[in-house]
Amino acid sequence: MKLTKFEIARILGARSLQISSGAYATIETKCDSSLKIAYEEIKQGKVPLKPIRPVKA
């Protein structure tokens, strides 16, 4: 499933907040910024968040 730019922005913000609050990163990196770590997780496909899209009837 390809993410839209809006879904990426929402997931990036939520994941960055989780990491800055003490959640463990799912990747190994030398970055200190939670935003950069979250972005790398999204690029590698290892972010533990998934968007829920409404089903069209």
UniProtKB/Swiss-Prot annotation:
The keyword Ribosomal protein does not apply. Its EC number is 2.7.7.6. The keyword Lipoprotein does not apply. Its main location: cytoplasm. It catalyses: RNA(n) + a ribonucleoside 5'-triphosphate = RNA(n+1) + diphosphate. GO terms for molecular function: DNA binding; DNA-directed RNA polymerase activity. Keywords: Cytoplasm, DNA-directed RNA polymerase, Nucleotidyltransferase, Transcription, Transferase. It comes from the Archaea. GO terms for cellular component: cytoplasm; DNA-directed RNA polymerase complex. InterPro entries: DNA-dir_RNA_polK_14-18kDa_CS (IPR020708), Pol_omega/Rpo6/RPB6 (IPR006110), RPB6/omega-like_sf (IPR036161), Rpo6/Rpb6 (IPR006111). It is found in: Cytoplasm. GO terms for biological process: DNA-templated transcription. Belongs to the archaeal Rpo6/eukaryotic RPB6 RNA polymerase subunit family. Part of the RNA polymerase complex. DNA-dependent RNA polymerase (RNAP) catalyzes the transcription of DNA into RNA using the four ribonucleoside triphosphates as substrates. HAMAP family: RNApol_arch_Rpo6. This is DNA-directed RNA polymerase subunit Rpo6. The gene is rpo6.
